[in-house]
Amino acid sequence: MMLSGSHFNGLKTSNFKDCGTLEAWNKYKRQYKCLFVYIDGTLVTNSSHHFPPYIGSCKALQENIDALNQLYYDGKVRIILTTSRPERYRDVTLEELKEKGIEYDQVIMGLPHSRRVLINDFAKSNPYPSAAAINMPRNKNDLRELLG
């Protein structure tokens, strides 16, 4: 661009990371994650809208909540909570998350109660493997260990 005569203007900047190479950029990015976390059975005990324990009346899986919140406060994750709870339970769910002190960026409701598969691309700028999955036993407080 410079050789073709394009004009450039300087801008005063602060608080930026100059990686310089693709390798350095990829190393820097590895600090950051986007976590898709299922609510029931991982952050609170499993619930139902058909029978007890009902949605909104679950017990907190506090060790898992603490592990997730620590990542949230470190500022290097985006937390997207997912659930099979129907959309009509959004207000109850958001209130439950607030009551239990669960931090998050987004909530996706209404997933089918079925197998979940994450499909992601990879490239030089997002090397293989670019995605991972953790399957954990329902209602167990072992998220911190599984996240490594």
Report each predicted region and the residues it spans.
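Conserved alpha/beta core of the MobA/IspD/sugar-nucleotide pyrophosphorylase nucleotidyltransferase superfamily
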Residues: M1-Y32
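HAD-like aspartate-dependent phosphatase fold
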Residues: R30-G148
